[in-house]
Swiss-Prot record:
Recorded name of the encoding gene: ATG21
WD-type repeats, residues: 265-310, 321-360
Protein name per UniProt: Autophagy-related protein 21
Organism listed in the record: Debaryomyces hansenii (strain ATCC 36239 / CBS 767 / BCRC 21394 / JCM 1990 / NBRC 0083 / IGC 2968)
Source species, domain of life: Eukaryota
UniProt cross-references to SMART domains, sorted A to Z: WD40
Region (Disordered) location: 360-380
Length: 532
C-alpha cells in the first residue's frame, strides 16, 4: 500500500509534488500532467515541464565529488521545489536511521548536487531563493544561505517530540512559515521560543549555535504590537508572553538575523501560520479553528531593520462555530483570497479585498444550523473580536476623512444603535468587556469590523476511512493552490492526502450586485486526476 507522506505546491502553484513510501513525483498543475517520477526521471511525456526561463540558482560545491543519480527505489518523506527551477530538495524516508538526510538535486540533469546530514529527524523544510530552513524534531531550525548552502544560523527552539506515555512518543507538527519573497521572513509561535533561542546575535556565520543571554529577555518590549494592559510593564520577558497566552507570534528576519515584530494573534495556541507571497500578510489559525486572522504588515520606507514592523490592519474571518483543526491556509497569487482547509472536510475561501458594493454595515451573524451544540463554540468569538483585535489609529483631528471613516466603521454603526441607551452601557457584562480592552483610551478611534464569512466553499466528494486518519495526524488534510485564468477568475487546485486525488475547481466570479453577508457559493468541479 502506497501512503502519501507529503503533498506540496511550489511557491507559484505551477507544480505539485507528491512524496510517498515508495516514490516521489512532480506534476504540472494547469494543464495537469506528470513530468517527473523517481522511477524514470524527467519524462516530459505528460504535461509541460517547469519553466526553465525562470531564475535558476546554481550551486557549485567545488569539491570534485561525483553527482549521484536518483535511484528508482525512493521512499520519500518530503520533496520541495524552488519555484519552477530544477533545484529540488529531497528528504529520503529511512526507517532505520530516520529522516536525517537532506539531498539537493538538479532534476533537469537528474544529478545530486550535495547532501546534508542532521543530528535529528527532519520534520519540515522551508525555502525560497535566498534561504533554506530545516526544522528538526529535537528542536532546532538550521538556516542556510541557499546560494552556497552555507550554515549561517541555528535557532534552538522547543522540541517537537512529546511522550504520550512511557512507551509511545508523539511527533508534533511544525507551525510556522517562511516567506517566498526575498525578504525571507520566518514566522513562528512564541511558544516555540525558549531561553536558549539566540534571537539577537546578528553575526553572520559566527557562533551559529550560541545560546541566548539574559539581555535578550529584556529586549522584547520594543518589538511588541498589541500588548494588553495586564502585561504593560517596563520590561517584558519571554516568560511574561508565554504566561499570558500561547497565541503570540514572532516574525524573524532570516536575512538580517534578527526579530522584527512580536504580536498577539489569538488567546489559544496556534495551529497554522502562513505568510503571503509578498510578505505583507500573515494568516493564523488557533487550535480552536473558529476564527482565522489576517494581519497586514507595514515596514518603514527606508527599510531600517532596527525598526519593528507595524500592523496596519487585522481582518477577522469566521470559518465556523464548531471547533475544528485547521490544517491548511493558503493565499492566492495576488493575495486577494485566502483558502482554509480543516478536518471538517470543507474548504472555505475568504475574500480579503473589499468589493466596491460592500460596506461595513453591521448585520447579525446568522445561526449556523450545522452547529447545534453551543458548548463546542469557541470562546474566541466574543472576547477576541472585542478585546484583542481592535486596531488603534492615532487620533488626528485634522484628518478630513476621519468622520467618514467613523461613519463607515463597524463601531460607528454600532455606536449609533446604542447611543443614548444607558441600559446597554451600564450592563455589567458590557463594562467587563470595556475594562479588558487593550486600547480603551483610543476607543473613539478604533476601526472595528465584524468577522467576514467565506464567500465560496468546496465539499470534497470523497470518503476517508477512519483507519487512515492517524496516518496524517489530521482528518481530511489537503493542500490548496491557486491559478489565475484570463476571464474566469481563479482556478482552485486541491490535493488530498487521504485519496491522492487532485481536483480543479472554478471559484465563483464576484457579483456586480450586493449580496447578503452570509451568502456562500459552492465551487464547481472542473476536473479530477490521480497523483498516485
Amino acid at each position: 500500500m502506497v501512503i502519501i507522506n507529503n503533498l506540496t505546491f511550489n511557491q507559484d502553484y505551477s507544480c505539485v509534488s507528491v512524496s510517498t513510501t515508495k516514490y516521489h513525483k512532480i506534476f504540472n498543475c494547469d494543464p495537469f500532467g506528470e513530468f517527473y517520477s523517481s522511477y524514470q526521471g524527467s519524462s516530459g511525456t505528460k504535461g509541460d515541464k517547469p519553466n526553465d526561463n525562470d531564475k535558476e540558482i546554481i550551486i557549485d560545491k567545488g569539491n570534485g565529488n561525483e553527482y549521484n543519480k536518483i535511484g528508482e527505489d525512493s521512499p520519500t518523506s518530503y520533496l520541495k521545489m524552488l519555484f519552477s527551477t530544477s533545484l529540488t530538495i529531497i528528504i529520503p524516508q529511512n526507517e532505520s536511521v530516520g529522516n536525517r538526510l537532506l539531498k539537493i538535486y538538479n532534476l533537469k540533469q537528474n544529478m545530486k548536487i550535495c547532501e546534508l546530514t542532521f543530528p535529528s529527524h527532519i520534520i519540515d523544510v522551508k525555502l525560497n531563493r535566498k534561504r533554506l530552513c530545516v526544522i528538526l524534531e529535537s528542536g532546532q531550525i538550521y538556516i542556510y544561505d541557499l546560494s552556497c548552502v552555507r550554515l549561517i544560523k541555528v535557532l534552538e527552539i522547543s522540541s517537537f517530540s512529546s511522550k504520550d506515555s512511557e512507551e509511545e512518543t508523539h511527533q508534533k507538527l511544525f507551525v510556522g512559515d517562511l516567506g517566498a519573497e526575498d525578504k525571507s521572513l520566518l514566522v513562528l509561535p512564541i511558544s516555540n521560543i525558549t531561553d536558549q533561542t539566540d534571537l539577537f546575535n546578528t553575526e553572520n556565520g559566527v557562533n551559529v549555535t550560541r545560546a541566548s543571554d539574559s539581555n535578550i529577555l529584556t529586549s522584547l518590549k520594543p518589538l511588541i504590537e498589541f500588548t494588553e494592559n495586564k502585561i504593560d510593564k517596563d520590561i517584558i520577558t519571554l516568560e511574561d508572553l508565554q504566561k499570558d497566552s500561547n497565541g503570540w507570534v514572532l516574525i524573524y528576519d532570516t536575512i538580517k538575523l534578527k526579530p522584527r515584530l512580536i504580536y498577539k494573534a489569538h488567546d489559544s495556541s496556534l495551529a497554522k501560520i502562513t505568510i503571503s507571497n509578498d510578505n505583507k500578510k500573515i494568516a493564523t489559525a488557533s487550535s480552536k479553528g473558529t476564527i482565522i486572522r489576517v494581519c497586514h504588515l507595514e515596514s518603514s520606507d527606508d527599510e531600517d531593520v532596527s525598526k519593528p514592523f507595524n500592523i496596519s490592519q487585522i481582518i477577522n474571518l469566521r470559518r465556523g462555530h464548531n471547533i475544528a483543526k485547521v490544517n491548511c491556509l493558503s493565499f492566492s497569487l495576488d493575495n486577494s483570497i485566502l483558502g482554509c482547509g480543516s478536518e471538517s472536510n470543507t474548504i472555505h475561501f475568504f475574500r480579503l479585498s473589499k468589493q466596491p458594493h460592500e460596506s461595513f454595515e453591521y448585520e447579525e451573524d446568522p445561526a449556523n444550523e450545522s452547529d447545534p451544540d453551543d458548548e463546542d463554540r469557541s470562546s474566541e468569538d466574543l472576547n477576541q473580536n472585542l478585546a484583542n483585535l481592535l486596531i488603534s489609529k492615532t487620533p488626528d483631528a485634522s484628518a478630513p476623512d476621519q468622520k467618514d471613516s467613523a461613519k463607515s466603521s463597524y463601531f460607528g454603526v454600532l455606536k449609533k444603535k446604542v447611543e443614548g441607551s444607558s441600559r446597554f452601557m451600564n450592563n455589567p457584562y458590557t463594562q467587563t468587556i470595556v475594562r479588558n480592552l487593550p486600547y480603551k483610551n483610543y476607543f473613539e478611534n478604533l476601526i472595528w469590523e465584524p468577522p467576514r464569512r467565506a464567500f465560496a466553499y468546496v465539499k470534497l466528494p470523497e470518503y476517508t476511512p477512519p483507519q487512515l486518519f492517524n496516518l496524517h495526524q489530521s482528518k481530511n488534510k489537503v493542500a490548496i493552490g491557486f491559478a489565475n485564468t484570463n476571464n474566469n477568475g481563479h482556478l482552485i487546485m486541491l490535493a488530498s492526502y487521504q485519496t491522492g486525488q487532485f481536483y480543479h475547481y472554478q471559484l465563483p466570479k464576484p457579483s456586480d450586485q450586493p449580496e447578503p453577508s452570509d451568502s456562500r457559493h459552492e465551487c464547481n468541479l472542473i476536473a479530477q486526476y490521480s497523483l498516485l
